[in-house]
Amino acid sequence: HKEYRRQRQMCIRDRDKVYEQLAAAEASGSAPRPARTGYVLLFEFADRSVETVKATASGRIPKRRKASGGNGGSAPDLDIVQTIQRRNASFERAVNELLAACAASGDDPVKLVYDAAAAHVPICPGAPRDAPLSPRTKRERFGALLSDPNARPSIVEVLQGLKEEPWWQDQIVPGGRRTFPAHEAEYAELATPLPEALARALQATHNVHRLYTHQAAAIDALERGEHVVVSTGTSSGKSLVYQLPIALALEREASATALCMFPTKALAQDQLQSLRALLGAYEPLEDVLVSTYDGDTATEDRFELRSTMRVCFTNPDMLHQSILPQEERWRRFFRGLRIVVLDELHVYSGVFGSHVALVLRRLRRICAALGNDSVRFVSCSATIARPAEHMGAMLGVDAGITAIEQDGAPHGAKEWAVWNAPLIDAHDPSQGRVSTYAEASRLFRHLVRRGVRTILFAKVRRTAEIVLRQIREDLVREDRAEVADRVVAYRSGYSVADRRRIEQDMFHGRIAGIVATSALELGVDIGRLDAVVMLGMPYTLASMWQQAGRAGRRNRDALVVLLGDPFPVDQFYMNNPELVFTQRDPPLVVDVNNELVLEAHVKCAALEVPIAPSEDVRYFGPRLPALCAALLERDGHGFYHYTDAPGAQPARELPLRGARQTSYTYVDATPGQPPRTLEEVEVERAIFEAFEGAVFLHQGVTYICTAVQHELCMARFVRANVRYHTRPRDHTDTDAVETWRIRTLPHADVYAYFGRVTISSHVWGYYKVDRRAQILDTVDVETPPLIRHTQGVWVDVPWAMVNEIAAHGINASAAIHAAEHAVLSLTPLFVASVSQDVQTECKVGKREYGGQSHPTRRKRPSRLIFFDKPGQTASVSARVFRHMDSLLRIALEVIEACGCVDGCPGCVETQACTEDNAVSSKHGARAVLRGLLRQPMFDEHDPPLDEQGHATSYLGPRDALTHTLCDAQPVPTAPDTEVHVEEITEDDTALPDMQQHAERPAPRLSPEPPAYVETVSPAPQPS
């Protein structure tokens, strides 16, 4: 080995010397053609981990392109021999197929091989070549290409050019290419024309001379006094639907005000500047104060804003916790309130949507108490099902809502491509697919080099940073540094100043491409974009269409590419691309009758304005009188007051999006420069990112963590140029620790339990991983655990059932995990929730499939467990507990009715799975549910063990199929507390509205997992 390294260094030194001589000769203009013998051609053979190959061969996908294996990914000698033999056989088979084909066609096989190899033969450095362009010339040419939108080729030409790339292997799946034709603009006139000066201001600031049909219809409806919801495509000019009515209302009444609510601060800032520009160009309103009022507003500025502001930009959280509780300070504003804007309506669903719906009812109630019945609500949304119905549920009104869904805005033709990374070896699919990071980099570079301004959406922050670094490195390697300088990342976590700078650079065309998370999914205007690449199937179909709408914002042709990950849900869509274009998410749901949510908001409302049940029942429903009697104090006039404690602030104790998290500050402590803050990161992320030795990426720059001060919530990083990233070695245990309630299910000895649940996350080390996902080193670290408390429901799976499943060659953990997914996906049938409102314990592939070669001492109880998102105050799991019998029955019906073989998003797989559905068995899930419902677990016609339906049968001995499980033991009750078994009632077994069930698309996806909290006490039981 030492001799090899010595010779290699000599070769490199000789090569560099020849390069220097050649450069000097070229500079003098007398460069002779050097002899070929003056060069040494170096080869490097980089093989994949054999254990990774074996994992893929067994039907499971390695998690997030990780290589499994020991220190460095080595494999036993026997595995290496088998791999070599298999590859020899593949090569021999390919040669024989070539010879047979040539014999039939009359071609010369040797000539074909030589011709095909020509493109792969390294070129001698001394071969004649064109003079290279200077870096300055390259920058100037590329800048000119970006500055002229018409200079780039058409999207059809760009796609055609893919076929000339050496890495092209027909990655667009069969049936995955679609063309959505261009749409011409449709205009309409307002029933009452705009004032001439306002029309001129609109032309000057927005370059709008005529209104589209949907804009005119919405403005006319608002002028008639109706509430309006506009559900049209991205970049269809929806903001004018509320900007113009606000201007008209402010001019009409000197005391009129408007309230604009946005789910994110970035979106609020974007629309704030747009409205300010319009009003500033309209002389009658040029002095109107338009401002934000949120958590960043300085305390000393708030009094003046409340007194003088006429248009307030805020968010639902600020309205709930700061504005409504100070009703007396906002009376001027509420009396004059004429327009309320609720942008991005599709965001408000599940528990968060239920909270916001009650906040809006409280707002309507305060305005009515002040004699203001002239408030009109206008909402904009991406395309959703039943927009009028959903807005009515949010506002608590049954009539007077106009829904506008016909889009009159123009758009260019849009090309869609469903793209699957190619197999590493077409003759040996067991080796898996090419890295999607590398595939995304190739596609992204192909686009931006041609002046196609591109945004690549990654599902998580870390992926965005890794892909950005790979794209930049690949561009520099191609000698295209001028392009690499114009590719940036955008995600939450960056400072406000950095994000505003990136937005402005993108808007003004100074950036060629951007790698982003869903932080750019909502409608912040970043200018013209030509292409969208989605790396991995988004968490919801609505998100997919929202991201796709980012392309083609300036009426030119555009491209959308859905690049599938190797995980089961993504591969389901790769194999069924028609579902990408035809499926839709289920209707959005809110539940203002949720006991805990309603109780909390009734307390808030009583503190704002005393409650008169006979009047306020229209806002809070028929349960209001009983709630007032139980929670509030009645005065002599029949009004109810909140008097729990002097100075109490119930709104402060009720976070709409879950409990506030502790944040860690990441500090750049690189020697030789002043310390600066990189990011502020929630604790549930920081525990997996910030430990000594961890590699952290920020804007594509690599940092290494040198110290973590948990008492100060601070982590220190220094810049380092390393060629690897780190992956934590961790585990998370979800344990039921205290039983509060027990219910019998109508099946003898099967029970459902409800109580306190603890979630403990531990990081005990990390892997150093190179860009090919090979493990370079294994390091141990000590970090404190992250412990969170919540409440949940669980059903124990008897050990006899576990043994029965293993006897049929199915991994028992895979069966239980798949059954949990099947039940979890159905919870919206009984309670208004999105999938992350209720969660489950997901199984890790390496641990579960390690078998006897990776024994574990950390046994997990054999049970189905579901729990509320930590920090949530709605107790969704309490309703899951109530309807557990129906959920088990419907889940079994869905699995048995699904036509897939190994599981799909329609039955046992979900995008919300934190382990990418690596541990899953459809047949096992069916057996678990049948057993809990006291039905025969297996049929005689079940497929034999070697068929595809038994994807986990390869594991061999029965112990290997249960080695991570133990018999679930009873969970104790609270000290000195006796819990009686509740009998199930007829209402609890009633099936939900099956029309809603029928509308649930087969591949039901779920939203991006939100952050957890550090420690949260269990929510109280309903009164």
Each model region followed by its residue ranges:
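Single conserved hydrophobic/aromatic residue that forms the stacking wall/gate
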Residues: 2-14
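Post-DEXD/H (motif II) to motif III coupling segment of the RecA-like Helicase ATP-binding lobe
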Residues: 347-407
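Extended, highly charged accessory segments
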Residues: 375-379, 385, 564, 606, ...
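Conserved segment of the helicase C-terminal RecA-like domain
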Residues: 546-587
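Conserved interdomain linker/interface between the two RecA-like ATPase lobes of SF2 helicase motors
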Residues: 388-393, 400-460
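Helicase-associated low-complexity/disordered flanking segments
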Residues: 63, 81, 85-98, 102-213
